[in-house]
């Protein structure tokens, strides 16, 4: 049996309950993170917590504990569940209010931490490669609901996933309102062409923690790299395409909109980055058990 942390208590996950008047439940009014633990270490915990607090600040939600206290709660939840390899979901909701929208009526934010054993999100597709679909639904505009706010309102992402599923894709690819490539339904996107790597700037997509780690690896390996706007033509004519995310890690895309990418197999640069990222997660992180 696994336990969930809920506002100061550890509760069996099958007994964990949220009020029907919690604005996180009613309106998606809250923020969250996705974090990974590998072999007893939490990968980039501080960076994830920094982003959680930035998301909260952006929606004027004050988290009632310090970052250090939040990180310790995450570690304690992992210990409580005796987990070494896990997916971690910290959540902060606006708290209990009424059926109106006014956030001032929510006096006490709710803090929840869920931890689950975790393996490979895409299974054998890391070897075969994913099929992706560019979807008709556009990514939330940065002047409406900025993608860099990791909010509980994920309907935009879910609509993209529904469309990709209906069209036989493993993953969706968003365009923004200007027609530029934004990101996947839950991951950032990279393009390899003639030995160089490009990725969209993060004004129209989430500033991914895994994205930043992969960029560090790219720079360390001396691979030419730049952030620039990417169009559909760049995807269709790429030598390699891959996505990065906490859950996905690095996943190769070999078909987009029915078009084979490169030779239709995970490319050499993508496979090298996957190997280096695996090494990084094995050696870096905050120890859970000390």
From Swiss-Prot:
Q: Which SUPFAM superfamilies match?
A: D-aminoacid aminotransferase-like PLP-dependent enzymes (SSF56752)
| Record-given protein name | Putative branched-chain-amino-acid aminotransferase
- EC number(s) reported in the record: 2.6.1.42
Under the heading Gene3D superfamilies, the entry gives:
3.30.470.10, D-amino Acid Aminotransferase, subunit A, domain 2
Entry-linked InterPro entries = Aminotrans_IV (IPR001544), Aminotrans_IV_CS (IPR018300), Aminotransferase-like (IPR036038), B_amino_transI (IPR005785), BCAT-like_C (IPR043132), BCAT-like_N (IPR043131), Class-IV_PLP-Dep_Aminotrnsfr (IPR050571)
Alphabetized CDD domains for the sequence: D-AAT_like
An example Pfam family from this entry, by short name, is Aminotran_4
Keywords in UniProt for this one?
A: Amino-acid biosynthesis, Aminotransferase, Branched-chain amino acid biosynthesis, Pyridoxal phosphate, Transferase
Pathway membership, UniProt: Amino-acid biosynthesis; L-isoleucine biosynthesis; L-isoleucine from 2-oxobutanoate: step 4/4; Amino-acid biosynthesis; L-leucine biosynthesis; L-leucine from 3-methyl-2-oxobutanoate: step 4/4; Amino-acid biosynthesis; L-valine biosynthesis; L-valine from pyruvate: step 4/4
Q: Which organism is it from?
A: Archaeoglobus fulgidus (strain ATCC 49558 / DSM 4304 / JCM 9628 / NBRC 100126 / VC-16)
Any one Gene Ontology MF annotation carried by this entry is: L-isoleucine-2-oxoglutarate transaminase activity
Which processes are annotated in GO (biological process)? Answer: isoleucine biosynthetic process; L-leucine biosynthetic process; L-valine biosynthetic process
The protein's role, per its UniProt record:
Acts on leucine, isoleucine and valine.
* Primary enzyme class: transferase
The cofactors required by this protein are: pyridoxal 5'-phosphate
Positions carrying N6-(pyridoxal phosphate)lysine:
150
Q: Tell me what reaction this enzyme catalyses.
A: L-leucine + 2-oxoglutarate = 4-methyl-2-oxopentanoate + L-glutamate; L-isoleucine + 2-oxoglutarate = (S)-3-methyl-2-oxopentanoate + L-glutamate; L-valine + 2-oxoglutarate = 3-methyl-2-oxobutanoate + L-glutamate
Stated family: Belongs to the class-IV pyridoxal-phosphate-dependent aminotransferase family.
